[in-house]
Amino acid sequence: MTTDQHQEILRTEGLSKFFPGVKALDNVDFSLRRGEIMALLGENGAGKSTLIKALTGVYHADRGTIWLEGQAISPKNTAHAQQLGIGTVYQEVNLLPNMSVADNLFIGREPKRFGLLRRKEMEKRATELMASYGFSLDVREPLNRFSVAMQQIVAICRAIDLSAKVLILDEPTASLDTQEVELLFDLMRQLRDRGVSLIFVTHFLDQVYQVSDRITVLRNGSFVGCRETCELPQIELVKMMLGRELDTHALQRAGRTLLSDKPVAAFKNYGKKGTIAPFDLEVRPGEIVGLAGLLGSGRTETAEVIFGIKPADSGTALIKGKPQNLRSPHQASVLGIGFCPEDRKTDGIIAAASVRENIILALQAQRGWLRPISRKEQQEIAERFIRQLGIRTPSTEQPIEFLSGGNQQKVLLSRWLLTRPQFLILDEPTRGIDVGAHAEIIRLIETLCADGLALLVISSELEELVGYADRVIIMRDRKQVAEIPLAELSVPAIMNAIAA
């Protein structure tokens, strides 16, 4: 970067945003230079999305100031932010796919004469705009005929043509292949060289080191630090994101005696293009396999492919030794696979339904709605699991939304245990629950394992994984990159593998 490019264009001072019981942003100082690519990183709940929404007028900060080119600004909405010079392009392009490229580039500001659209002039200007960044395409074609990468490039060109001085790219590479990523990076570098400042939000660390000039890390709503990319080793970056220091302590514990050498579930070269790279995985009765990695590394996608939410398009799956085609969650459930998702409020519980109704849901779906479970049987089932798992609720008819996070998690576990699975996937089972419930869930996981259940546990709590997993698989950039056996298992070993 030149000396001029080191000039600050955007700055926040003490920016804070509060929601009931949550500090989404806490006194954040953020700085962006003219003509640089700034990577904005952080785990789930770090505050990245809140910061972006504050900068673009979606949220109004409760405290603090936003400065753009030395002037204090207060964006009222995204349109106002765009007028001020701050544009945003999201992973899901917010354009009109059935309209032409030219229409999308100039929608709302079409060239007109006497109230009539001057289409040829618009198409000429659109062609020239795309060509100015090295892209030759027929701007008369509908946007949806082009790749996702090209649609994003069109969205970026539109934002820049609207006089964006600062461009925020929120997970732009999440659904792109390698060639498409490089195409996007070429455009980002062109924009940087022309003096545009970019904020690049991503979870792909390799891409951060490919394209960014500096890195800002947020954690738990607070500013952790900003470093020059070329001066920040990846292991240091991971420490900043996770908030942990590497030490040499490794927990020594005996391995479990597996009930059988034959895997309950075995996946060979199993994957889905654009979702998760082909992977190999075997899980045996009475074994806990951990899945570790940063947010966006592919942990949840692995679970969704296994459970048939996003059916695989490559490889083979053997369930209890027999080849199976896992095309849906219902099919996976029938074959003895259960899945407790990470976001229990969105993907797990039915908030307004009772504890009883939430518990019997998976079993009823497995049986089919032509074989309804009687109300008496439902009541007996619910009472049994409330007793066995220690679910704290006034009654089986209490709406689950009024239960604590830990008790909601126990209800979800009850739902799947009722189907008598042989292989259970738990995605962040202890997230968002209090300390007491946290310990109870971990004890329950170990009890299920002792009873012969095969478990795949996704967790960001590395100490937890080290405490109960028999081995841990490391994910990075939607690929399996390492496996750590019990004898070598420690928090530093996991962190080093994540950052390698």
Curated annotation (Swiss-Prot):
Transmembrane segments: none
GO cellular component: ATP-binding cassette (ABC) transporter complex, substrate-binding subunit-containing
Organism domain of life: Bacteria
Membrane topology, as annotated: Peripheral membrane protein
Function: Part of the ABC transporter complex YtfQRT-YjfF involved in galactofuranose transport. Responsible for energy coupling to the transport system.
GO molecular function: ABC-type D-galactofuranose transporter; ATP binding; ATP hydrolysis activity; ATPase-coupled transmembrane transporter activity
Record-stated family: Belongs to the ABC transporter superfamily.
Domain spans labelled ABC transporter: 10-245, 259-497
Gene3D superfamilies reported in the protein's UniProt record: P-loop containing nucleotide triphosphate hydrolases
Record note on quaternary structure: The complex is composed of two ATP-binding proteins (YtfR), two transmembrane proteins (YtfT and YjfF) and a solute-binding protein (YtfQ).
Subcellular location field: Cell inner membrane
Catalytic activity: D-galactofuranose(out) + ATP + H2O = D-galactofuranose(in) + ADP + phosphate + H(+)
Family annotation (InterPro entries): AAA+_ATPase (IPR003593), ABC_carbohydrate_import_ATPase (IPR050107), ABC_transporter-like_ATP-bd (IPR003439), ABC_transporter-like_CS (IPR017871), P-loop_NTPase (IPR027417), YtfR-like (IPR049716)
Alphabetic keyword roster: ATP-binding, Cell inner membrane, Cell membrane, Membrane, Nucleotide-binding, Repeat, Sugar transport, Translocase, Transport
Originating organism: Escherichia coli (strain K12)
Major site of localization recorded for this protein: membrane
EC class (word): translocase
Name of the protein in question: Galactofuranose transporter ATP-binding protein YtfR
Pfam families, alphabetized: ABC_tran
GO biological process, one term: hexose import across plasma membrane
E.C. numbers: 7.5.2.9
